[in-house]
């Protein structure tokens, strides 16, 4: 019983965050949060763990992003189709600091973000100015993030 519960928790610990709205007329603190999340442009996606710190950052930019729990199949498909190999520095010139701007999957180093195309058939009935509950695209969408990501790959 406990092992089943733990495996379900492990799968739901990974969130996919997709930036839906653009760069114009953003407050300074919102811009900084997007920089910390590495979501610089519209239709970029990051995959993060569901920690309280990252959850707070996502809730701060909730009016500009959509997020939900990503399945293993969708994550594998995103890595296969849109994963970019990391080509930056691993250490600085004096070996004092190591960079962790990459994720190691199957022995390969990938960037932490995915550049996606706009979704086929759009975001929703009401577009990008309303929440997902109201028929738009913003906010938490749970497992339905997988459908959106498959349309964006």
PLM regions: where:
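Core subunits and conserved enzymes of cellular information-processing
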Residues: 1-153
């Amino acid at each position: 019983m406990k092992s089943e519960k733990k495996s379900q928790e492990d799968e739901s610990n990974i969130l996919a965050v997709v930036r839906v709205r653009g760069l114009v007329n953003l407050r300074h603190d919102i811009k900084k949060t997007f920089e910390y999340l590495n979501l610089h442009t519209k239709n970029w996606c990051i995959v993060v763990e569901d920690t309280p710190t990252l959850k707070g950052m996502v809730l701060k930019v909730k009016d500009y992003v959509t997020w939900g729990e990503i399945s293993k199949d969708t994550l594998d498909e995103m890595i296969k189709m849109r994963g970019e190999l990391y080509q930056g520095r691993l250490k600085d010139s004096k070996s004092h600091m190591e960079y962790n701007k990459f994720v190691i999957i199957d022995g390969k180093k990938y960037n932490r973000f995915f550049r996606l195309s706009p979704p086929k058939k759009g975001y929703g009935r009401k577009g990008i100015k309303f929440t997902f509950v109201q028929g738009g695209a913003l906010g938490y969408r749970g497992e339905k993030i997988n459908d959106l990501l498959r349309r964006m790959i």
